[in-house]
Amino acid sequence: MKVKFLGSFFEEFPPPDYPEVVFVGRSNVGKSSLLNMVVGSKVAKVSKTPGRTRAVNYFLLDKKLYLVDVPGYGYAKVGREEMEKWRKMMERYFKERKDNIKMAFLLIDAVAGVQPLDEQMIEWFEYYGIPFTVVITKIDKASQSEIAKTLKQVKRYVGDGAIVLSSAKEGKGKKELLSRILN
């Protein structure tokens, strides 16, 4: 797989020349780490500091698909103005790119479970008709009971189908995610 970083975008997004797969979720849920794990190289910047990704980052996969890493939501230390800016940017992204998005991966932390802003993202996906898969992340850091609880929460929204358990650290879920990206 050949991955090329195209840039960070705040206002204008790249031309919709390729289908897009977008990684969405709360701050520090592991979007950049998961993207790196899936493509097998460290193309997306990773930080332990929540709220580090501030722009919509585009990567070109094998000259046929955009992988999109978006800023996380729900970081408490970000001011109200910054949160509103994020909300508007994301709403504009989904509105403008809805026909170009092949798949959205909604990442949910195995320990934290489904949060109200995750529910709002699911509503956005449904409203804009965007196909999505819930990726339960950081299963290496969660107990079996935490994973079971989060799975139960997620199944209320998506049934049994569109769920992948993952650990970027251990490479778990890579095969399923690649299959959903490439098919």
Swiss-Prot record:
It comes from the Bacteria. Residues 17-183 form the EngB-type G domain. GTP binds at residues 25-32, 51-55, 69-72, 137-140, 166-168. PROSITE patterns: G_ENGB. Mg(2+) binds at S32, T53. Its cofactor is Mg(2+). GO terms for biological process: division septum assembly. Pfam families: MMR_HSR1. GO terms for molecular function: GTP binding; metal ion binding. One of its GO terms (cellular component) is cytosol. Keywords: Cell cycle, Cell division, GTP-binding, Magnesium, Metal-binding, Nucleotide-binding, Septation. PANTHER family: ENGB-TYPE G DOMAIN-CONTAINING PROTEIN, MSS1/TRME-RELATED GTP-BINDING PROTEIN. Necessary for normal cell division and for the maintenance of normal septation. Belongs to the TRAFAC class TrmE-Era-EngA-EngB-Septin-like GTPase superfamily. EngB GTPase family. This is Probable GTP-binding protein EngB. It comes from Aquifex aeolicus (strain VF5). The lineage of its organism: Bacteria, Pseudomonadati, Aquificota, Aquificia, Aquificales.
